[in-house]
C-alpha cells in the first residue's frame, strides 16, 4: 500500500459528436499508435451502420451491447499453502466497462468482414442481441467463476 495519497483517475473528455464519456473511452481503447481521428472515424461509421441496420438510436445500441458484455464476476489467482486457487471476485464498475470494451474490440478484430468499421458494427449488433464472440467471452468468465465458487471464502 502506498503511504502517500492515492492519485485519482484522470477525467476523460466526452467525445465531440455524441458527448458521451463511454464512447470517448471506447475510441481510446480502439486507437492504435495514437491515431485518434482514425479510431473516431471507425467508431462513428460503425455506429451509423448499427443505427441503420437496427433502426434504434446510435448510443442505445452501443449501451445495450456494452451491457450484454459487462462481466459481473471474474476469477483471480490466489496462492494458499503451495497451491494456487482461482478465487471468484466481483468486478468493480470501472473495470466492468473497461473489460467489456476491450473484449468488444478484440472480438471485432478477429472477425472476417472487410473494414474495421463493418467488423465493429457486426460485433456490437451481435452483442446487443446477446450473441457473438464478446458475449461468449463474458459467459466463459462467468462459468469459470461459477465453477470455482467453492474457493470464494479465500477472498482478500
UniProtKB/Swiss-Prot annotation:
PROSITE patterns: RIBOSOMAL_S7. GO terms for molecular function: rRNA binding; structural constituent of ribosome; tRNA binding. The keyword rRNA-binding applies. GO terms for cellular component: small ribosomal subunit. SUPFAM superfamilies: Ribosomal protein S7. One of its GO terms (biological process) is translation. Pfam families: Ribosomal_S7. It comes from the Bacteria. Keywords: Ribonucleoprotein, Ribosomal protein, RNA-binding, rRNA-binding, tRNA-binding. One of the primary rRNA binding proteins, it binds directly to 16S rRNA where it nucleates assembly of the head domain of the 30S subunit. Is located at the subunit interface close to the decoding center, probably blocks exit of the E-site tRNA. Part of the 30S ribosomal subunit. Contacts proteins S9 and S11. Belongs to the universal ribosomal protein uS7 family. This is Small ribosomal subunit protein uS7.
